[in-house]
Amino acid sequence: MHLSELTHPNQLHGLSIAQLTQIAAQIRDKHLETVAATGGHLGPGLGVVELTLALYQTLDLEKDRVVWDVGHQAYPHKMLTGRYNNFHTLRQKGGIAGYLNRRESPFDHFGAGHASTSISAALGMAIARDLKGENFKVVAIIGDGALTGGMALEAINHAGHLPHTNLMVVLNDNEMSISPNVGAIPRYLNKIRLSPQVQFITDNLEEQFKHIPFFGENLTPEMQRLKEGMKRLAVPKVGAVFEELGFTYVGPVDGHNLEELIATFQHAHTIPGPVLVHVATVKGKGYAIAEKDQVGYHAQNPFDLVTGKAKPSSKPKPPSYSKVFGETLTKLAENDPRIVGITAAMATGTGLDILQKRVPKQYIDVGIAEQHAVTMAAGMATQGMRPVAAIYSTFLQRAYDQIVHDVCIQKLPVFFCMDRAGIVGADGPTHQGMYDIAYLRCLPNMVLMAPKDEAELQRMIVTGINYTDGPIALRYPRGNGYGVALMEEGWEPLEIGKGELLRSGEDLLLVAYGSMVYPAMQVAEILKEHGMSAAVINARFAKPLDTELILPLAKQIGRVVTLEEGCLMGGFGSAVLEALQEADILVPVLRLGVPDILVEHASPDESKADLGLTPPQMAETIMQKFGVPQRATVVTAS
């Protein structure tokens, strides 16, 4: 059977090991071919090909439920559930999403983009099943470090207290999140994986049973039960932590041995109550380059399959905001032992890998544990340290109570650095950094700032380090800067709450925040061509606003436009409106930003065009709102 003929996962039932092996090879080929062309997550999906095939052969997905954690592990799942022929559209506008999406397929039983949610969701399904008197299996697949997340442990704690609720948790243990796993739980799992007794039983017992004449080949499920029993005799502590928490522990099992996996899952389905199946996999399996560099090939931009190297761009690009952040913070940390960079399993993505290499004592990776990261930072701040919590905008949402309760109420000087703020592109709605302005602006004692370019980012990093009167948050976008000159040292901090007037004008006031400042300057140029004179303010701070700069100009000019790369509800434009209202300045205001919608996966440029946030589109919207001279011809987006 060719994978293109498979439209339903139940077609896997009854296929031989040889046929499944052939399909596994087709999945890997398609996975590699597609990600090399479109970009996307590479290593996670390659590591779960056999796991997915074996599990789905033992389930009836007409009724059974499968919940994948994180979602980027699930590329093989997508190919096996009717999306193989469209898989080439992965992460492209209008194509297959890079994460699970209930709107995309009835087999995506629960959406996921963030980590550690699967066990909670699966347990909810299992409890609902039992309350309704229904009968189907529920399986959660958790991996890529997600078991280090507190929510996963909360769910395990709850599920273990429900001995009559049938639930299978498959632990895809590849020893990695994006970076290598950290913490006591991964260390415990490694002890199980590396136990000589367990390895001997796993590697040798099955082969010995196969040599029993006549019926050795047919003993697979029973053999699996015997292997589990012998592991417990040889190593009584195997899986003890999970057993003490109320789960029946099964494993570890070779995650790339189809025969052993099928037997293990068949055996696990017969065990009543919560069951945890520990599957040892290799991230990037089947692509030697990815197996060797599991961090670098967790996710990739388009690359050459033969060399593994990124496809060259037409011209050299300026450094990314993440790199500028990492380099600048590291230089400051080298001269200030109070500075500590904190990441939640995202060292490379945030640029803190630079700090990790050069000043390792001032670097902490807490694993996928944003809540812990924030409160730990708060504790460090009480002792005079300068904690810098470098967390993507979308992931900082996970620690909201800690920001409120442990940081803001106590007015502790924690410096939040939010990478990927704004439109992120192909990762889609689970990863868009749309909401941080709104969800942080409402908090007492919080200061918010955003740079117009990478040079201003450097100054804001120094500003955040120097600010000790409470928490301060810095947002900056995904991608490369503008190529402006950068200083190696001697950065001057900014005055809190002070913006800058970049351009004078008489007809219109553009007040832009962060990544929208340069586009605002382009808008002003377009408007100039149509006879409109626009002043441009780089706000720098969303809280506190520079009302001394904004309000007099708003009153004088009489027409205001705000520009932000974030949600309009409660965002930067709302802050300007509130300031105008409180000052009794009643002038027309146009807010440009992201409306009350989910921004689906597409390139950042495509998303901005869809939202009307390209400079020509914004200029057209402004002229439609406020009117233009009769001689004007509106410039539209091509």
Swiss-Prot record:
Instruction: Give its E.C. classification number.
Output: 2.2.1.7
Say if the entry is tagged with keyword Lipoprotein.
no
InterPro entries per record: Dxylulose-5-P_synthase, THDP-binding, Transketo_C/PFOR_II, Transketolase-like_Pyr-bd, Transketolase_BS, Transketolase_C, Transketolase_CS
Q: Do you know which SMART domains this protein is assigned to?
A: Transket_pyr
**Reaction equations catalysed:** D-glyceraldehyde 3-phosphate + pyruvate + H(+) = 1-deoxy-D-xylulose 5-phosphate + CO2
Which NCBIfam families does the UniProt entry name for this protein? dxs (TIGR00204), PRK05444.2-2 (NF003933)
What the protein does comes down to: Catalyzes the acyloin condensation reaction between C atoms 2 and 3 of pyruvate and glyceraldehyde 3-phosphate to yield 1-deoxy-D-xylulose-5-phosphate (DXP).
The family database entries (PANTHER family) matched by this protein are listed as: 1-D-DEOXYXYLULOSE 5-PHOSPHATE SYNTHASE-RELATED, 1-DEOXY-D-XYLULOSE-5-PHOSPHATE SYNTHASE, CHLOROPLASTIC
Kindly provide the name given to this protein in its UniProt entry.
Answer: 1-deoxy-D-xylulose-5-phosphate synthase
Gene encoding this chain? dxs
